[in-house]
Design a protein with these regions (language model features):
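Feature for intrinsically disordered/low-complexity regulatory segments and propeptides
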Residues: 1-33, 40-43, 47-57, 195
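A cross-family detector of function-defining hotspots
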Residues: 58-63
Length: 262
């Protein structure tokens, strides 16, 4: 669910399993203050607690609400962009996971479709969100200073093609890698569903209405990547916690080289 900054900052403090957690504002404003040096554009997604109160009009009461999952995305301005893509730095936290966690990460976003692009695990930091303890925001400065090699990967994919006669074999490899590939940051294992590979395959060679459909000839690796990341990015809010990890796994499933950011 997308909301405004004002609505976000109304999030109440909460107690989970006898542990006290701060208000939403206490967690997000130090991040927003740091990123406001670079941008004034923030996108916010949340998942409220399962039990919510309604006002007299039957609408969600934002004056009495707890957000269990929060994603604040700071969208960087033009000087950080490159053709067809922008960059963003995000703070994401979840209180209702097995261990409450928070993540700070940088990724690229394709302007035309808002698909995430992730090629380096070094752009992510994951920490346990301990009760009655402030977050450590130092990685914000670090990630802004890392060299972003996304442009190199995008150019490489644009010049790489999958031979059409091998697409059936590739589907088998993709499904196998979805089964075997995993991302573990120390707070649980993240995987791509096998159906992700099948759905991406359909977008590439079956669904004629798909933006990534290739009617004839070889298939551009860039389109294959976008078909996968479209599924991960636009999952109707089912999983906002692990989008970075799942998007990174797309590159692994497609057999793309890992990027090391310095």
């Amino acid at each position: 669910m997308q909301i405004s900054l004002e609505q976000l900052c109304a999030g109440k403090a909460t107690k989970i399993k006898n542990k006290e957690y701060f208000t939403t504002k206490d967690y997000v404003m130090p991040f927003i203050d740091r990123m406001s040096k670079f941008t004034d554009k923030f996108e916010i997604q949340v998942k409220p607690a399962d039990q919510i109160s309604l006002n007299s009009d039957g609408e969600m009461n934002f004056e009495d609400i707890v957000y269990n999952r929060v994603w604040v995305e700071a969208q960087l301005p033009g000087e950080y962009a490159y053709e067809g893509h922008t960059q963003s730095v995000s703070l994401l936290y979840a209180l209702d996971t097995r261990k409450p966690v928070y993540k700070i990460f940088q990724n690229a976003v394709r302007s035309a479709c808002l698909n995430m692009c992730v090629f380096s695990p070094n752009m992510l930091q994951v920490r346990e969100l301990e009760s009655e303890t402030a977050m450590d925001y130092s990685f914000v400065k670090q990630v802004m200073e890392l060299t972003d090699n996304t442009r190199v990967m995008l150019e490489q994919m644009s010049n790489t093609f999958i031979k059409r006669e091998t697409i059936f074999d590739n589907l088998g490899h993709w499904v196998d890698r979805c089964i075997s590939s995993k991302f573990n940051s120390g707070f649980g294992t993240v995987k791509l569903a096998e159906s992700t590979a099948i759905d991406a395959y359909k977008q590439l060679v079956v669904d004629t209405k798909s933006d990534y459909y290739t009617a004839e000839g070889d298939i551009c690796m860039f389109d294959a990547y976008q078909a996968f990341t479209d599924i991960v990015t636009h999952d109707k809010g089912r999983d906002i916690v692990n989008k970075f990890e799942k998007t990174y796994l797309v590159a692994e499933v497609l057999g793309l080289p890992q990027v090391n950011n310095i």
